[in-house]
Amino acid sequence: MNEAVSPGALSTLFTDARTHNGWRETPVSDETLREIYALMKWGPTSANCSPARIVFIRTAEGKERLRPALSSGNLQKTLTAPVTAIVAWDSEFYERLPQLFPHGDARSWFTSSPQLAEETAFRNSSMQAAYLIVACRALGLDTGPMSGFDRQYVDDAFFAGSTLKSNLLINIGYGDSSKLFARLPRLSFEEACGLL
């Protein structure tokens, strides 16, 4: 049986963690980005399909390439973040299933149903984005996930000619807590959950 993590870890991962819009000028190393992936890759996905593909943008040139895709409300926070991750999904993720899920012919589940393949890729890459956020928090980083961007522009600018399609953006760095908004409420258990 697993042991519960400490109250401090729960605070870091959930109750005290915030979505950041402002950033300190502390850089995030490439080694730290590798550590993030080394943690997040272990999160579960359907049939271990692991459809997420991530581009970590950490240069001024990369940010300028991304700039035209950003909504006005997400522009400044993204340009000043040390790293912006494009979380994409591979529309042909199933080509890796013989390696990732060698328990029967899982590849055929998706090659025979393009709709199932797309739904699976999008849903599971979204879950993997959440794992990325938790991995960042576990390593002492802050994040700012965003869906306010022109996905078609990002796909054309970063993934043209490939099987990748963008899902969401996540700013990564060390947040400036002085720029946080007041914490917003969440739904109660009674409002969000049911017991049968």
From Swiss-Prot:
Gene that produces this protein? rutE
EC code: 1.1.1.298
Q: Which family does it belong to?
A: Belongs to the nitroreductase family. HadB/RutE subfamily.
Recorded protein name is: Probable malonic semialdehyde reductase RutE
Instruction: Please state, per the UniProt record, what induces or represses the expression of this protein.
Output: Up-regulated by the nitrogen regulatory protein C (NtrC also called GlnG) and repressed by RutR.
Q: Which organism is it from?
A: Escherichia coli O127:H6 (strain E2348/69 / EPEC)
Q: Which InterPro entries match?
A: Nitroreductase (IPR029479), Nitroreductase-like (IPR000415), Nitroreductase_HadB/RutE (IPR050461), RutE-like (IPR023936)
Give cofactor(s), names only.
Answer: FMN
Gene3D superfamilies, alphabetized:
NADH Oxidase
Q: What does this protein do?
A: May reduce toxic product malonic semialdehyde to 3-hydroxypropionic acid, which is excreted.
List UniProt keywords, sorted A-Z: Flavoprotein, FMN, NAD, NADP, Oxidoreductase
Instruction: Spell out the Pfam families in the cross-references.
Output: Nitroreductase (PF00881)
Q: This protein's superkingdom?
A: Bacteria
Q: Which reaction does it catalyse?
A: 3-hydroxypropanoate + NADP(+) = 3-oxopropanoate + NADPH + H(+)
The molecular function GO annotations come to: 3-hydroxypropionate dehydrogenase (NADP+) activity
Coiled-coil stretches noted in the UniProt entry, renumbered to this chain: none
Report the enzyme's class at the first EC level.
Answer: oxidoreductase
